[in-house]
Structures are given as structure tokens and as C-alpha cells.
């Protein structure tokens, strides 16, 4: 009887050890899985960051994506020239009779260009890009609110892009603008962890889907474009009415008073204001109470360039109360960061980073800094349990 009891005890002890081992393995596996949510308003640079992660930690872009990018990039350029030509026709820039034919085609009938045979499409792109009125535009209105950010990269590269043997580079794909619809997820190994990065569309119609991904989120990376301070939301109607100088307050699509948005036309919302409001509403969500928050203040390069032509306080008068006679990128970026921190409870920590999503090394370094915080917090929470 005693031998039977001892055998049963040994078997029970062995079974307990096996269970404990399995629990440790499962706990270790759970530790290694990190769920990150990438959020932000449209055109903030979220998808560009995902592309950089693919370049850094996965296999980059496949052949099909490269081929498809030819058409997407050229459509990016056509859409940009549509806005540019529309602005030109409503400004005091001189347009010759010869130039006016293609300028009006881009401004009012750009859809016809997209339907052209490739050789004809390339001919009109190359022709209009060399016009004197286009050169004047970039000298005077390069940072007009209606000018998409990517054209500052594509325009200097048009000779290469608008050629019949064009093959997009990885850098071209990173600068390419393609609206994120639905949910895009990638997973990759990073040190001893498995990162699950989820990118959800930033358009207003897409945001109702976000809540389905809030549970179990280790970190939220919220992306804001620093250069969006003179832009309005993309989904709202736009009016093409401009004066010839960007420095006049009456030329602004948006007029601000006492730090509050007052719009000339109903429905127009300043994109930076929208980004701040969205961040704060997400920060208060109960599902994300224990999540780390990383703020990516993106497009710092465009902010620097834009501030040489545009006065920040014309859009945010409260900036003058914060600092006087300073339109520098450093001060403006600090002011914008404070907009996000305002009203944030002390115990709710936020880690802010200045980023340039189109530069691979910048995102790689920033992501490493974020992971140092995220992994430490993740292990800390696990140990407390």
C-alpha cells in the first residue's frame, strides 16, 4: 500500500511540474507578444511608419507592389498638380496662353489625364512641370495649405519618375501617398519580442473601427503632422479662394480667434486641432488605461521649411502669448507638444518624439527608444501580477 501511495505521489508531483513548466512557457510566450496600435488623423504619416518597419524588420516591398507604385505615384503627381494649377488660376501668377491649355486641363479635368495612354500622360506631366508659372508657384506658394506634402519630394524627381522606363525605388514608395482603408497589420521579431503592429485608417469614417482593437494594447503610437497647422481636414469640403500672399490672415482657409477655431465656411476644421482633440479622446478611453502612449510629432523637416514662408501665430494666436517674435521650428514644435500635454493627468505619462517618417534611420532610432520604454513597462506589469 505504501509503495502504491509513493508512486501516486511521484506521478502527481511530475504532473504538477509539467503543468508548471507549461504555464511558464505560456507566460513567456505572452510576455514576448507586444500589441501596438498606430493611430492618427489622415495624412499624418502613419502608413509611412509602417513602410519603414517593413524595410527595417521584414522583406521590404515585393515586385507587385513596386509595379503598382508606378501608377499610384503618377496619380499622386497628377492630383498635386490639380491643386497647384487651381491655385495658380486663382492667384496673380502670370499664365501665358500656351500654358493655360494644360494648366486648365490639370485644374478642371485631371481625370482625363489619368485615362490617357502612358506616353501621352507622361508628355503632359513633363510639359506642365517645366512651365514658368509652375516654377513661380513653387517659389511663392510651395507651402500653401492645399499643396500635398509628397510633391516636395516628387517634383525634384520628375525627370526620373515621368520617364517610360521608370522603376520606383524604396524611397519613392515610402513617400508615396495611398489612403489607408480598413485595417493593416504586420508582425515582426524585434530583439526577444514579437511585435504586432496595427495600422487603422485615419479618416473619420474609419475611426469607429478603432475601438475593436483597443483591448490588450501594450502601446499606442499616435502620429501627428507638425506641418498640418495651416491645413484643414481632408474629408471636409474645400473652397479654392485665395489672395496672392500667404502672409495675409484673410488668405487663410481658417481664421482663428482667441485660440478657438472660427471658420469662414461651415465644416472646415484645422487639422492640428483635430489631431489634438482626437489624441485626448483616445487617451481617456478606459480600454487604454494601462497602455503606454508614444506621441510621434512627425514631418519635422516640412515644419522647418514651412516656417520660412508661413507664420505659425497667424493660425494659432495663443502662440504669441507663449513666446514673442519667434517663428523657429524648435519653439513651434515645443508649443505643439504642450497642446497635447495640456490637461493630461500627471499619472498618465506620454513620451513625445520628433520624427521624420520618410527617413529610415530616424524611425529606426525612435522605435528603439519607444521599445526601451514599452518592454520595461510590460515586464514591470507582468511581475506585479
Curated annotation (Swiss-Prot):
Residues 32-385 form the G-alpha domain. InterPro entries: Gprotein_alpha_su, GproteinA_insert, P-loop_NTPase. Residues 355-360 are annotated as: G5 motif. Residues 195-204 are annotated as: G3 motif. A lipid is attached at residue 6 (S-palmitoyl cysteine). GO terms for cellular component: axon; cytoplasm; heterotrimeric G-protein complex; neuronal cell body; synapse. One of its GO terms (biological process) is adenylate cyclase-modulating G protein-coupled receptor signaling pathway. Residues 172-180 are annotated as: G2 motif. It comes from the Eukaryota. Keywords: GTP-binding, Lipoprotein, Magnesium, Metal-binding, Myristate, Nucleotide-binding, Palmitate, Transducer. Mg(2+) binds at residues 47, 180. GTP binds at residues 40-47, 174-180, 199-203, 298-301, 357. A lipid is attached at residue 2 (N-myristoyl glycine). Residues 294-301 are annotated as: G4 motif. G proteins are composed of 3 units; alpha, beta and gamma. The alpha chain contains the guanine nucleotide binding site. Guanine nucleotide-binding proteins (G proteins) are involved as modulators or transducers in various transmembrane signaling systems. Belongs to the G-alpha family. This is Guanine nucleotide-binding protein alpha-5 subunit. It comes from Caenorhabditis elegans. The lineage of its organism: Eukaryota, Metazoa, Ecdysozoa, Nematoda, Chromadorea. The gene is gpa-5.
Amino acid at each position: 500500500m505504501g509503495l502504491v501511495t509513493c508512486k501516486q505521489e511521484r506521478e502527481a508531483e511530475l504532473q504538477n511540474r509539467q503543468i508548471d513548466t507549461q504555464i511558464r512557457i505560456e507566460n513567456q510566450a505572452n510576455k514576448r507578444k507586444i500589441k501596438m496600435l498606430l493611430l492618427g488623423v489622415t495624412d499624418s504619416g502613419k502608413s509611412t511608419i509602417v513602410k519603414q518597419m517593413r524595410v527595417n524588420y521584414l522583406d521590404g516591398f515585393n515586385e507587385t507592389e513596386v509595379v503598382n507604385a508606378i501608377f499610384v505615384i503618377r496619380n499622386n503627381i497628377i492630383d498635386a498638380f490639380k491643386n497647384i494649377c487651381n491655385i495658380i488660376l486663382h492667384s496673380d501668377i502670370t499664365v501665358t496662353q500656351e500654358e493655360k491649355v494644360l494648366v486648365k486641363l490639370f485644374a478642371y479635368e485631371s481625370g482625363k489625364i489619368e485615362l490617357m495612354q502612358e506616353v501621352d500622360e507622361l508628355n503632359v506631366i513633363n510639359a506642365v512641370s517645366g512651365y514658368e508659372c509652375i516654377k513661380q508657384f513653387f517659389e511663392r506658394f510651395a507651402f500653401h495649405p492645399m499643396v500635398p506634402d509628397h510633391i516636395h519630394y516628387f517634383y525634384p524627381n520628375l525627370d526620373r519618375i515621368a520617364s517610360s522606363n521608370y522603376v520606383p525605388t524604396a524611397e519613392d514608395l515610402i513617400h508615396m501617398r495611398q489612403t489607408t482603408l480598413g485595417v493593416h497589420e504586420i508582425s515582426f521579431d524585434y530583439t526577444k519580442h514579437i511585435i504586432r503592429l496595427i495600422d487603422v485608417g485615419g479618416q473619420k469614417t474609419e475611426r469607429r473601427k478603432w475601438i475593436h482593437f483597443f483591448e490588450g494594447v501594450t502601446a499606442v503610437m499616435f502620429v501627428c503632422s507638425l506641418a498640418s497647422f495651416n491645413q484643414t481636414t481632408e474629408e471636409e469640403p474645400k473652397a479654392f479662394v485665395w489672395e496672392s500672399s500667404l502672409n495675409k490672415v484673410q488668405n487663410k482657409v481658417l481664421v482663428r480667434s482667441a485660440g478657438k477655431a472660427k471658420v469662414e465656411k461651415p465644416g472646415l476644421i484645422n487639422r492640428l486641432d483635430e489631431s489634438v482633440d482626437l489624441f485626448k479622446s483616445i487617451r481617456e478611453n478606459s480600454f487604454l488605461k494601462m497602455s503606454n502612449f508614444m506621441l510621434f510629432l512627425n514631418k519635422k523637416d516640412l515644419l522647418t521649411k514651412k516656417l520660412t514662408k508661413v507664420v505659425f501665430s497667424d493660425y494659432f494666436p495663443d502662440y504669441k502669448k507663449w513666446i514673442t517674435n519667434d517663428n523657429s521650428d524648435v519653439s513651434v514644435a515645443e508649443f505643439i507638444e504642450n497642446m497635447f500635454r495640456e490637461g493630461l493627468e500627471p499619472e498618465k505619462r506620454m513620451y513625445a518624439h520628433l520624427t521624420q517618417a520618410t527617413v529610415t534611420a530616424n524611425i529606426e532610432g525612435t522605435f528603439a527608444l519607444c521599445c526601451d520604454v514599452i518592454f520595461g513597462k510590460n515586464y514591470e506589469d507582468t511581475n506585479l501580477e
